[in-house]
Amino acid sequence: MNVYFECKDTLFVNLPRNNLEMKYTLAHLEFEHYPLLLAPMEDVSDPPFRYVCKLFGADVVYSEFISADGLIRDSVKSIKKLDFEEFERPVGIQIFGNAVEPMVEAARYAETAHPDVIDINFGCPVKKVASKGAGSGIMNDIPKMVAITKAVVEAVNTPVTVKTRLGYDNEHREIVDIAERLQDVGIAALTIHGRLRTTKYSELADWTLIGAVKNNPRMHIPIIGNGDVVDGPSAKYFKDTYGVDGLMIGRASYGNPWIFSQIRPYLETGEELPLPDVAERVRVSRIHLERSVAWKGEHIALLEIRKHWAAYFKGLPNFKPFKMRLMETLNVEEVYGILEEILVYYNDCGL
């Protein structure tokens, strides 16, 4: 068993070197640069997608969220989500639920996979989750939220983190108080998505309360910001304006694993790298498919990667006929052939 953490007090710590440099550490794991994290995303952040994001510089990656009830019932789908490769480390496993005992049992189960972090999802706004008092739905019951967190922290040796939102609705923007209470029961870090449960993704993220948490003198754990980080300029703005200890990138990485390698130089030097050309999109989408086939088998891989095709080739003129063919075939060699056709067609177009 690999032990990646020495204590539960800190996830990201900035250590000054020579009064000029900053070193970012994950317990004894150290980053030479500002941390960029891939968000846990249902039906997206599986091992093949995490692999390609890791190739392009995601510092920490997370599993899709896993139902506590599913894990303790030995649901095949839930257990499969515990899979990860050593290449992915540091890696977090995220669980969700609405009661103490199932969450404790699920956390212990997740710990047997030896992740670097166990993350609790208190942020999902999807109705089927929130309506049952899980995800961001639990923000209606902050004492229960704190009780679950405390019990999970005490039940496992792996550092526990939380991902949540600003509050349930406009009348309950309570994240400053919530953050203190979660810190007090022992979480190692807190990721805050800058929207409410009720706004889902319909408005721009509000980072002012994320900044308020980060600048609260009572807070000493790392605060990771999430929401509307879409490119280098937005990443630099949120980092510099609100002082968060890391940035978590979610939907903007979908079909765009290059976002991590584009943000990094912008943060460090202000350099804006060009968007990937068609050859690079074909190359990386093929890697994604190959990893998916190896992990899931050809049939399931070809069904599940369909949602990624439009994202990988977003913005290309006249792509619809290729997309339709990619969506229809269940033969992996045929997909590879279509990808080669895409490469030839757009090379001829000068793209």
Labelled PLM ranges:
Residues 132, 138, 142, 268:
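Proteins enriched for Cys/Gly/acidic motifs involved in redox and nucleic-acid/cofactor modification
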